[in-house]
Amino acid sequence: MKFIIKLFPEITIKSQSVRLRFIKILTGNIRNVLKHYDETLAVVRHWDNIEVRAKDENQRLAIRDALTRIPGIHHILEVEDVPFTDMHDIFEKALVQYRDQLEGKTFCVRVKRRGKHDFSSIDVERYVGGGLNQHIESARVKLTNPEVTVHLEVEDDRLLLIKGRYEGIGGFPIGTQEDVLSLISGGFDSGVSSYMLMRRGCRVHYCFFNLGGAAHEIGVRQVAHYLWNRFGSSHRVRFVAINFEPVVGEILEKIDDGQMGVILKRMMVRAASKVAERYGVQALVTGEALGQVSSQTLTNLRLIDNVSDTLILRPLISYDKEHIINLARQIGTEDFARTMPEYCGVISKSPTVKAVKSKIEAEEEKFDFSILDKVVEEANNVDIREIAQQTEQEVVEVETVNGFGPNDVILDIRSIDEQEDKPLKVEGIDVVSLPFYKLSTKFGDLDQSKTWLLWCERGVMSRLQALYLREQGFNNVKVYRP
């Protein structure tokens, strides 16, 4: 099988040296992602496209899907590469390839040509289009808005019969820009802002401020791992977890109620800046949007920025919530975010929307900054690839089974879309559907006399959720890995 990768248009308008660097990085990223599917595949870069050739036909759909999620790719063409002799030969090959698709349809032919030939692209379009129209009686030529567009590419003595076109996510290849550190909470905003910086070519590391115990961290790990696995797995990134409960306790005890929200955010920026400096990261990323909550007014954002020299990027600053939720839905983080608790918003009963610098600084003089230094020093830093393995160690008390007994029921915790695409059927046992994002509220409604075997395709989510349910006091859960 063969895929032709078309570059994001902004890459093609760069200077020659920059364009070549971007293409080289994108080629490496594609190799890093696809080697998990087929170690024998070849990735070859050219001036205006990248060619991917693989032998394992069983991995066709997986490879195609992975390519659509790699930043820097505008679209992917799945092609059949064949030699040709003349225009009539092109027509005959196109007829074999497209006859079934064109039955009863309107169509047009579009050709791109490179190399020296005694015909033009338009000549091929007319010849092939006329031939298809004559040989497929139910098909009809329509040059404007046809039902089917026959795409052909001619390069020297090779013909590319385009079997399908699939849109990529665009953007710049990860690694073409410098690293950033995303302050991730697991909600709608931080997930989308992290994705947007990945799409813009940054390697995104994650910094999580834990305000809600182990269950909160488990949920945020899921989001970070999902984002990395889906859009950024070409690179190694860090997941840094900071236990911020001591900081919150100090704020609640010593800081005036109205100033708590801004001061908490200032403490987070201070801590994240220390982490960024430690690892040589150039900027912080937040999901803040102007006016969305009290700490996100211009006055308060300016005061928050003042505590650090580190650049703070806010890609969602002008977005409204509906737009952000729609983006979360598109990238697949909506279900995570809907069940993620938001702790920052409840720290103050009457937060100020226009904090005064002198008052903020006066309140912060009451704060014991050794507490902040200590939590940063004790921050837990892991390679995000190890999250799955770390989860295995943490849930060692949760039994993993590959079979089942008479009192067992399999609980399919995949999202609804995944379940509809690939329904789970196991002979000899009941399978119940309950998406992972409903477990926290709906698992208690299930028959607790049964033993529930949590299942997901890769096993990461089922292990994380098993740990969460154990912490909630449910001991009748196991992880099912046949």
From Swiss-Prot:
Name of the protein described by the UniProt record:
tRNA sulfurtransferase
What family is this protein classified in? Belongs to the ThiI family.
Organism name = Escherichia coli O1:K1 / APEC
Q: What is its EC number?
A: 2.8.1.4
Enzyme class, one word? transferase
Q: Which residues form the THUMP domain?
A: 61-165
As its record notes, the protein acts as a catalyst of: [ThiI sulfur-carrier protein]-S-sulfanyl-L-cysteine + a uridine in tRNA + 2 reduced [2Fe-2S]-[ferredoxin] + ATP + H(+) = [ThiI sulfur-carrier protein]-L-cysteine + a 4-thiouridine in tRNA + 2 oxidized [2Fe-2S]-[ferredoxin] + AMP + diphosphate; [ThiS sulfur-carrier protein]-C-terminal Gly-Gly-AMP + S-sulfanyl-L-cysteinyl-[cysteine desulfurase] + AH2 = [ThiS sulfur-carrier protein]-C-terminal-Gly-aminoethanethioate + L-cysteinyl-[cysteine desulfurase] + A + AMP + 2 H(+)
Give a short account of what the protein does.
Catalyzes the ATP-dependent transfer of a sulfur to tRNA to produce 4-thiouridine in position 8 of tRNAs, which functions as a near-UV photosensor. Also catalyzes the transfer of sulfur to the sulfur carrier protein ThiS, forming ThiS-thiocarboxylate. This is a step in the synthesis of thiazole, in the thiamine biosynthesis pathway. The sulfur is donated as persulfide by IscS.
